[in-house]
Amino acid sequence: MSQLRKIRYRLFAWRSFPKLQPAEEPIDVVIPIIAKDLKILPLCLEGVRMCVVHPIKQIYIVAPAQPEIIQFCNDHQLQFVDETSVFGFAPKDLHLQLDYGNGLTGDRSGWLFQQLVKLSGKVGTCRYYLCIDADHVLIRPHVFLTNDHKTVFYMSYEEHQPYYDNIHQLLPELKLHHLSYVDHKMLFDKEQLKKLHQAISKQSGESWIDTILNSYNRHCHAGFSEFELYGNFVMEKVCRPWLQKRLPYKCLADYETLRRKWSGSRWSLTFPDYMRQNITVQV
């Protein structure tokens, strides 16, 4: 990331913001996962149930139909959604094969599929739904929709130029924010998503899914961001700093211990997969 973006974020985070008044409208929560996410998911769920200030109608887990995932959903009062039912095809059917050069290749079909699920508006019954990464843990109360129905976006200092290059392909006239919407969580409005799908399809003449797939740079490991695309597309919104802390798996503890230790200075914690070890989460 650039030094300029770091400075902009710090200035933004140091500002004093008025308290947000949350909407009373219920929301759904939609979490796409694969089996390896089950170790960290209990902490994510506890954070959602403790810190999302809106009424939650249902929590949906979108995943492969594997016995351990279905059993986890039954044990934790979650609604399981077979990932192949969302679009009528499986992640592997995207065939997103990458060429990194020097004989190195990769398959990002599953990674992109989860992003398309978040953008689909096809899961849940509420107009608004919160998507959150399985390794992200909320430790302070979060408002995602204000009482005048503006979406709240929690801004970060992430900076990855291929995301912005991709957006310029999809929607060339879209003005981009000087901070990042990549925040591990986002509230989606199905009405806004309809407009986004239409705008993407109008630009290309193809379906929004095919347009995104065709726009992906096959030489780039991470060439698309659903959060950057949607956040920049929504016009009526409220922005706040994310105040997040990234931690290695060796720092895992039960939820209350994490909350007591970090909530004085941070609003959320993330335990990235690349910092993962074979550790059982305490719940």
Task: Report each predicted region and the residues it spans.
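The conserved acidic donor/metal-binding loop of glycosyltransferases
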Residues: 133-137
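Short, acidic, metal-binding catalytic loop of nucleotide-sugar glycosyltransferases
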Residues: 46-56
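Active-site-proximal specificity loops/subdomain of glycosyltransferases
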Residues: 69-120
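Conserved donor-nucleotide/metal-binding helix-loop-beta segment in metal-dependent transferases, i.e.
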Residues: 138-171
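Short aromatic/hydrophobic "clamp" motif used to bind/position activated sugar donors
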Residues: 129
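Catalytic core and acceptor-binding pocket of nucleotide-sugar-dependent glycosyltransferases
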Residues: 181-266
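N-proximal low-complexity "stem/linker" segments adjacent to membrane-targeting elements
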Residues: 1-43
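Short beta-strand/loop segment that forms part of the nucleotide-sugar
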Residues: 55-66, 81-85
